[in-house]
């Protein structure tokens, strides 16, 4: 690949990528979820049966995980689901060559039986606003040309022509909040990091980190973004580094995400070869590069200071704050940390403007949010909806409701740190403030649906077991407190509980909450409170 040195070079590269773009192709969903359901066999079958007849694009997750393995035939948008390798020959002969729809491969409404031919008409997709996930079916994550054809890196070129302060002001005006759980305003965080970088000597090193340590049970939003559209995250990081004044970046991703690691590694190398990473990016004089750090999968390493310890080669355990990472972070240098989804939003804000982004969502929760909708729901998968959509709309309109005629009982949001929201609150808007008011959190985006047969005490026991295993053990209150709470809850599930156990459990929960150092311990009692 020829290294591009100017915005004009990028425009020419973008033009060539558009010329290569095929209007007619089959998009095969091949993220981790698809591969677990046999998508590679579908890929092999298409390469055998359809070679020379249609362009084959192996992509990240299409979102509708319940329908895996699935494909989309473009430009029509024909959606076929639950495919087997032996189905491919018929699809090539009938649909690709003759234009005939094969009814048995279509998605059918679980209640009415109505078949849907086109992806955009399926209720699971129709209700969503897929600003981040919508590009996945069009992008082979190992081919940078696909990203360039979707206006990739044009936002970077635009950002490099304006001042760092102007970029930060755009992010602030957009109202973007961190998508990793805490919901801290991203623009404010960048502003603090920028001031810290400016106050240091010009030669001083500062860092940015992409936190891809996604540890909540049932959550896989970040994994799917990295697998399906890694360049969107990389572009956001480059823009952020330029705005803040950082010159080195890290993507911290757990080693149990091998496909994400593979696709991000390829994307970084391609970006480096073309000049989006390295020295003098697009002739701007700005130098920046990204490295990957693989985590061992410890849940506590999602906490910023523990993550930093892990990158430094130390045991991943939280440190007391202040100083905060923005002041003294990685290797003792100023460090700004955002999660995968936050970084992926940056290029869209630069491209479409702060006003466009802030027009989506609610007063204090702007933009869209990706959720992994799992559990006792008909349409499991990745959903991207505007902030402020109600739980009822997400679970019943997008998710299709509860299977087997069962009744809805509760939905757990925010992972182990979150809470369970009962049926009476189904019309609650899904935004940061509304979820916090009812004792839960947005978290990174996990959403576990439970039906009438789910025992809530068993749910509490499950999360306490998880948290006991994942606690770093540094704080006595967390280490022993979670253990004791789990013992009490276990006794209750085994019929050995006593009435006074409930008061003991409540008192113990508040001690753990109030005396633990990091977010894991501070929110560990949530499953029982």
Could you say what each language-model-derived stretch is?
Residues 156-196, 358-359, 364, 372, ...:
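Accessory "access/gating" subregions that flank catalytic or transport cores
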Residues 127-128, 261-387, 399:
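Hydrophobic alpha-helical positions that pack around
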Residues 236-240, 388-403:
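Short amphipathic, charge-patterned alpha-helical segments
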Residues 229-243:
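Histidine-anchored nucleotide/phosphate-binding helix
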Residues 196-205:
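Short, basic, low-complexity termini and linkers enriched in Ser/Thr/Gly/Pro
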Residues 2-24, 39-60, 75-104, 154-170, ...:
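Ferredoxin-type iron-sulfur electron-transfer modules in oxidoreductases and energy-metabolism complexes
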Residues 30-38, 171-193, 297-309, 313, ...:
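Conserved phosphate/anionic-ligand binding catalytic regions in large, soluble enzymes, centered on
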Residues 77-173, 277, 306, 310, ...:
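Fe-S ferredoxin-like electron-transfer domains
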């Amino acid at each position: 690949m020829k290294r591009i040195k100017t915005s004009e070079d990028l425009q020419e590269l973008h033009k060539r990528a558009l010329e290569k773009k095929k209007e007619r192709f089959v998009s095969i969903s091949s993220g981790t979820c698809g591969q677990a359901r046999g998508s590679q066999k579908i890929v092999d079958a298409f390469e055998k049966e359809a070679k020379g007849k249609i362009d084959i694009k192996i992509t990240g997750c299409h979102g509708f995980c319940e329908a895996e393995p699935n494909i989309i035939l473009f430009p029509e948008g024909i959606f076929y689901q639950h495919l087997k390798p032996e189905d491919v020959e018929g699809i090539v002969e009938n649909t690709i060559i003759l234009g005939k729809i094969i009814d048995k491969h279509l998605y059918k409404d679980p209640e009415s039986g109505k078949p849907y031919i086109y992806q955009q008409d399926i209720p699971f997709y129709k209700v969503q606003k897929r600003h981040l996930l919508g590009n996945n079916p069009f992008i082979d994550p190992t081919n940078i040309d696909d990203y360039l054809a979707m206006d990739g890196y044009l936002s970077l070129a635009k950002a490099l022509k304006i001042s760092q302060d102007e970029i930060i002001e755009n992010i602030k005006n957009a109202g973007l909040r961190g998508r990793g759980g805490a919901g801290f305003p991203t623009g404010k965080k960048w502003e603090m990091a920028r001031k810290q970088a400016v106050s240091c000597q010009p030669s001083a090193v500062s860092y940015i980190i992409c936190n891809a340590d996604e540890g909540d049970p049932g959550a896989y939003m970040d994994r799917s973004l990295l697998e399906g559209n890694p360049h969107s995250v990389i572009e956001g990081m480059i823009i952020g580094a330029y705005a803040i004044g950082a010159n080195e970046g890290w993507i911290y991703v757990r080693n149990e995400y091998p496909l994400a690691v593979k696709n991000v590694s390829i994307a970084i190398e391609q970006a480096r070869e073309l000049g989006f990473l390295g020295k003098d990016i697009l002739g701007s004089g700005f130098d920046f590069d990204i490295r990957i750090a693989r985590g061992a999968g410890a849940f506590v390493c999602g906490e910023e200071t523990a993550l930093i310890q892990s990158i430094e080669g130390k045991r991943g355990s939280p440190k007391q704050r202040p100083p905060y990472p923005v002041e003294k972070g990685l290797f003792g240098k100023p460090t700004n940390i955002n999660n995968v989804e936050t970084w992926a939003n940056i290029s869209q804000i630069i491209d479409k403007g702060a006003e466009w982004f802030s027009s989506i969502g609610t007063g204090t929760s702007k933009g869209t949010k990706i959720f992994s909708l799992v559990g006792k729901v008909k349409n499991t998968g990745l959903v991207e909806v505007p902030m402020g959509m109600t739980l009822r709309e997400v679970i019943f309109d997008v998710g299709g409701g509860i299977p087997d005629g069962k009744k809805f009982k509760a939905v757990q949001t925010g992972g182990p740190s979150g809470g369970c929201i009962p049926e009476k609150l189904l019309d609650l808007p899904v935004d940061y403030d509304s979820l916090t008011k009812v004792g839960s959190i947005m978290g990174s985006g996990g959403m576990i649906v439970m039906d009438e047969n789910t025992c809530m005490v068993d749910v509490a026991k499950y999360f306490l077991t998880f948290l006991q295993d994942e606690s770093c053990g540094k704080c006595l209150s967390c280490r022993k407190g979670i253990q004791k709470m789990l013992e009490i809850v276990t006794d209750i599930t085994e019929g050995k509980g006593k009435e006074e156990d409930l008061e003991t459990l409540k008192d113990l929960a508040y001690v753990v909450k109030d005396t633990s150092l990091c977010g894991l311990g501070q929110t560990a009692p949530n499953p029982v409170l």
